[in-house]
Structure formats: structure tokens, C-alpha cells
Amino acid sequence: MTRTVLVLNSGSSSVKYAVLEPDSGVLIADGIVERIGQEGGAHDHAAAMRGVFDSLAADGHHLEDLGLVAVGHRVVHGGPDLYRPTIVDETVIDRLKELGPLAPLHNPPAVLGIEVARDALPDLPHVAVFDTAFFHDLPAAAATYAIDAEVARDWNIRRYGFHGTSHQYVSEQAAAFLDVPLESLSQIVLHLGNGASVSAIVGGRPVETSMGLTPMEGLVMGTRSGDVDPGVIFYLWREAGMPVEDIESMLNRRSGVRGLGGEIDFRELHRRIESGDDAAELAYEVYIHRLRKYIGAYLAILGSADVITFTAGVGENDAVVRRDALTGLAAFGIEIDEHLNDSPGRGARRISADGAPTTVLVIPTDEELAIARACTGVLGARPGDG
């Protein structure tokens, strides 16, 4: 029987799932159970997990017939010591709970999802795959914050980076698409979704990334501010009397493109700009300005880029964002072919002009497949496993 992996991404109000064949890359089934704890939705995560199984069965995919060999769990933050795909046991769960404050929006529901899934599928190995893992070995100059060294050491404060599963997968796919060794490439990967990050990768290893201790640092995102002067936080706390929890919520949920323009759907944002909406236009300009700022910084770090790749929802589907991000960079060897960029397409594709020194690609990310393959990789490495 073909072996498969169930991949789960458990959030506070939803559970996304996918069943894949890691060897072939075939997606057997996927879906999402939403509105957990809300009216009309699943009562709790245990009910949501039953909803996953019910949805699979309704599509003719019964658990006992799927050939499942593992359950893979996306976990956003692995902290300083969880940086490889890890088989989950009680010790790992306890450690993940300790790491909750580093990713308060993401880690606690992920842990809850792991616990529920282990109860539901106790005979399968459960593997945690961490967004931070790819960036564990960032150069010290990139990973270190210029704060009191003793405080940073005592509290494990460093730049961890996120979306690592996506950045690694896309950088490897770029090399495969170009049919050149990964080790030979200097790359910039732009993961542009509701959450957004950029990485600089040399020879398959990251040398810089935009997110830091938490997923709040870096680019302007759908609802997150990205880079902000820490003084803003102190000012709002002292002068506006805002509790720290309210400031954190604002920076996570009511900032970014939504905070400036009241909208996170870029299709609607473009429509509003065309209709003369000043707030939407400013939100977009701030978003693009920050994106170009990071691209320029990473070009300086790399010296030059062999490949720049766009991925995730906005990166894969918004030709205007891609054009505006790279306009005027011909002096750096970066030119987009307008026709290729504007042409709808599926799968990996080149959008750079013929003869341009830097190849610009659009590559769909597939974090679920990467997680599934990470699961079978760690299982295959266990003593006694084939």
C-alpha cells in the first residue's frame, strides 16, 4: 500500500488538513474545518478533529484505507532547541507549552491540535515540523539583536525567522526548475501572503530573513505592522494608557495593510485604489516601499541575486505587486517581462525578461508536502526503520 501522511495546521479557530503521498507528491485530500468555538462551528478542537475525519470519510477516504504512516503538525515556533522535525512525546508537548509566549497566536492552538490528534490517532507517530527550523543556523550577525547580551542569553532572545518550511521548499524548487545545483545559487525568496517574509539564501542555506523573535518583524503584512520603532510601544503605554496586551493585539491584528487601508484582500485594495481611495493607496504604497527596502538590503548582503522568487497567495497571484516590487532595478540585473508577469499561469514559471542576469520566478509553495516529506524523513532515520 502507498504510504501517506496526514498534515494538520491547527489554528485558534480552524484546522487545515491534507493527506498526501510524500514520495510522489500526490495530494489525496485536503480541506479546512472553520469557526471552532463559534456559533455554527465545531464546539472545540476535539470536535474539529472529528470533523476532519468526517470530511475525509464523506469524500470516500476512510482512515483505515489511507495507508497513513504519520501525522505531521505545523508548529510556528520551535524556540532555541526544537529545530528539526521531531517525534512528539509528552516532553516535547511540555516544551512547546513553555514556548507559547514567543508565538501566542500560533503555538497554543498548535499544541492543542497536537494533543487532540494524538488522542484520536494514538497508534501513529506524530511529528512536529517547525517554521523556525530552516533559520536555526543563521549567521550570528543576522540572528543577534543589539540588546544587553546577558538579557538576550537568559531569555533566548534572538532572530528565529518564520515561514522556513516555505522558504526552504521554494528555494529547492527554484533550483530544480532551473536545473542547476542548489549549492550554486544566491537567492531571494519573497513569501507574500497575509503573513509575509523575505529571505536571502546562499547555497541552500539562509543568511538573512525578515522575521525575528516573533512573526511580527519585517515586511508590512495583512494585519501585522512589521518593523516598528520600539518607542511606539512605550509611548502608547505611557501616554495613551494602552495596556501591553492591547498594543500587542493592535500590532498583530489591526495593523499592516488592514490597519492603514481597512482591507487585507489585495484584489479589493486595487479596486479601491482605482476608485480614488486615498487610504487604500497609502496602504499599498507603504507595503511596496517596505518590500523594496528589504529587497535592496538583501541585494547588498548577497552582492547580487541569481534568482528572485515570489510565492504564497499575493506573491503567486498579484502581478501588480510583483511588478511594483521590482520596477527600476535593471541596474541590478533585475527586469520583469510584462507579458510573462501579466499572463495567468499555474505552477512554476519564469517572469523575467530574456537575457536578464537575475532570473525572476513565480513558484507555488507547498508547505503541506514539505511537512509530509519531513515526517517520512525523520521516521526513516529512526533505528530499526527501513
From Swiss-Prot:
Pathway: Metabolic intermediate biosynthesis; acetyl-CoA biosynthesis; acetyl-CoA from acetate: step 1/2. Its cofactor is Mg(2+); Mn(2+). Substrate binds at residue 74. Its EC number is 2.7.2.1. Mg(2+) binds at residues 9, 367. It comes from the Bacteria. The keyword Methyltransferase does not apply. GO terms for molecular function: acetate kinase activity; ATP binding; magnesium ion binding. The keyword Metal-binding applies. This is Acetate kinase.
